[in-house]
């Protein structure tokens, strides 16, 4: 009967590498092979597809790995073994699985209450990333909206309206797409001055050298006077 001698291994070509870094613990890798065969991998967790573990020739093949733990994957391979038992391998580009969110720590809260409508907040983060906030007015700095590790980061908000800001957050998103948030202490922006109204004026003329003046105010606060002798 006819028989075939085949000593040529399948040739694999990368189509789409695994995104890196990524928080996707079941990543996919796309490749082509010039021969059909059985697929295997050096990654110990294996793959969920294709199932069964066979691939065809001359079309894009997708391998989706089983759940992978966090870490750097270096020098890992996929292999196609043809019917003659020749094995052709392809080394995957190094990739990182990262599911840990950045951790943010407060350094200096926003002063409250304050009439500063562009307040600043200081914090640190253990991971670099992109900064965002749920305060709708946003921030003017940093610009671009990136932060680094190892030093105090300052965020300065755009002009904020008067009011109480409660439960607001800042968020750092790392390169793998993990979000770490920090809730700001409640703060108040108040640019409205107290309104004073006279109740009883100082009697005049008078021989009283320590006169009294009676008034009302719409807000509590610290009292001063332009009279140099004070009160």
Language-model features: locations:
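Extracellular beta-sheet repeat scaffolds used for adhesion and glycan interaction
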Residues: 38-84, 130-175, 182, 222-231
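Short, solvent-exposed loop/edge segments of extracellular or virion-exposed proteins
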Residues: 10-24, 102-116, 195-208
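Extracellular/lumenal ectodomain signal focusing on beta-strand-rich modules
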Residues: 2, 14-17, 67, 75-77, ...
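Acidic, Ser/Thr
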Residues: 30-34, 123-126, 214-218
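Flexible, low-complexity linkers/stalks enriched in Thr/Pro that connect modular domains
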Residues: 1-10, 93-102, 185-194
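Extracellular and select intracellular beta-sandwich modules with Ser/Thr-enriched
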Residues: 87-92, 179-184
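Structural beta-strand segments of beta-rich domains
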Residues: 25-29, 117-121, 209-213
């Amino acid at each position: 009967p006819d028989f075939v001698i085949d000593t040529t291994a399948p040739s694999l070509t990368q189509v789409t590498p695994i995104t890196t870094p990524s928080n996707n613990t079941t990543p996919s890798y796309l490749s082509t092979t010039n021969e059909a065969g059985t697929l295997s991998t050096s990654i110990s967790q294996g793959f969920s597809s294709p199932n069964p573990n066979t691939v065809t020739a001359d079309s894009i093949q997708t391998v989706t790995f089983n759940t992978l733990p966090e870490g750097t994957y270096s020098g890992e391979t996929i292999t196609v073994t043809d019917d003659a038992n020749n094995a052709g391998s392809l080394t995957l580009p190094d990739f990182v699985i990262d599911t840990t969110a950045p951790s943010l720590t407060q350094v200096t809260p926003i002063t409250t209450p304050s009439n500063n409508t562009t307040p600043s907040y200081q914090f640190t983060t253990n991971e670099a990333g992109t900064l965002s906030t749920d305060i709708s007015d946003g921030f003017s700095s940093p610009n671009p909206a990136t932060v680094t590790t190892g030093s105090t980061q300052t965020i300065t908000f755009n002009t904020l309206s008067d009011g109480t800001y409660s439960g607001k957050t800042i968020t750092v998103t790392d390169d793998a797409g993990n979000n770490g948030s920090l809730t700001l202490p409640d703060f108040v922006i108040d640019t409205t001055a107290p309104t004073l109204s006279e109740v009883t004026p100082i009697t005049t003329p008078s021989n009283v050298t320590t006169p009294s003046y009676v008034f009302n105010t719409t807000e509590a606060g610290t009292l001063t006077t332009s009279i140099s002798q004070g009160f």
